[in-house]
Amino acid sequence: MKKFLLIFILFILGIRCYAQEKIPDVHIITSKFDRIEIIRMNSATDLLIGLNEAVQKRNIKNAVILAGIGSVTDYHFHVVSDKNLPPAEEFPKASVPKDLISVQGYILNGRVHAHITLSDENSVIGGHLEPGTKALTFFIVTNGVLPDDLDFEYLDNYKY
């Protein structure tokens, strides 16, 4: 019984030490693209729905969203609104025409995490893409597809 208790205590201490290991402030993953995919979406297409559809159709597990252009009739995104963790968020949404001047982000284990930048003659706005951003003319998005064996689901988790 004493031996079991000693092993149990050492096990618990080991878990505590492992949990307290410092995660590096900078984490680097090296890879190459398997392929480049260019996705075109027609007028009235929802950008996030279209990206998710392309990910499913082309069986994309991991990718870098390299570029995106187009124009919108409606937009919806979210932005952080304070310095706390987890941060408070605001969800701007409007039905106005704007140019889509960039899309970038990642596909992490099949999950789209995209940010958009929009402009008109007076302002530039943007944030984390939400459903409801719809094409006026078209969207073109370029994805650099990465190997499936990369494990970086955690990259966009602030708790990591």
Give each language-model segment a name.
Residues 15-19:
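Sec/Tat signal peptide C-region and signal peptidase I cleavage site
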Residues 20-45, 49-56, 62-67, 73-113, ...:
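N-terminal intrinsically disordered, cationic/polar leader segments
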